[in-house]
């Protein structure tokens, strides 16, 4: 009766869709079946944290993902919040329960050899557009900046004497990114071609043929078009080049803290995922090369 009254509450008072109500009911039913199988009975008013933990383990053993398990726990939390409000229970058995952590997918990136081949073999075309498009790909790879940071770059943000770019990241936080001689040459070339081809233009560093600032979809599609030449890539966005920058830096012995600053991450935990990515690559090489792997 308690489960039915909870589902009716969701259905008639919260106006949840029938599909959602049935999903809540199925989640509670799964716990009920587990309790009956393990202990021969199920009483919602007597459920304790130990039972919930055992159920979580059984779900993970059966191949449920962390996301699925956490969704089921969310259903149970709603059920016991309802029972607390109704005065049926005095303690929530899930109060000390923490669901399994979702595994973050490793970032998609290009190997250095793949990146070199892409840049060496791609014909970006002649004139202003070809010069600009090549520089965009090169700058993403050389600096690791975000798409929004690249299109937000103004002429005044480029300091050639110090070889520094001033970029504005998330929450308007500014940081300085150094650049090398190869990128500097490409930038000089682009500026000369740009200024001659489009004398009247905005203050933006990267511009369209009409002189206006680039927009996100234009740059996204440009990057996607060029990354499509790498058959092994599943994702083909500007962020792949950001991932490639970070992974390349770490593979060449850059300090994790330095890479964090260059990427503009607030927490080093965010940057650590690239260290995991490089480690996964090492494991792959080991398995392919070692006779005992």
Residue ranges and their predicted role:
Residues 1-293:
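Conserved catalytic core of the tyrosine transesterase superfamily
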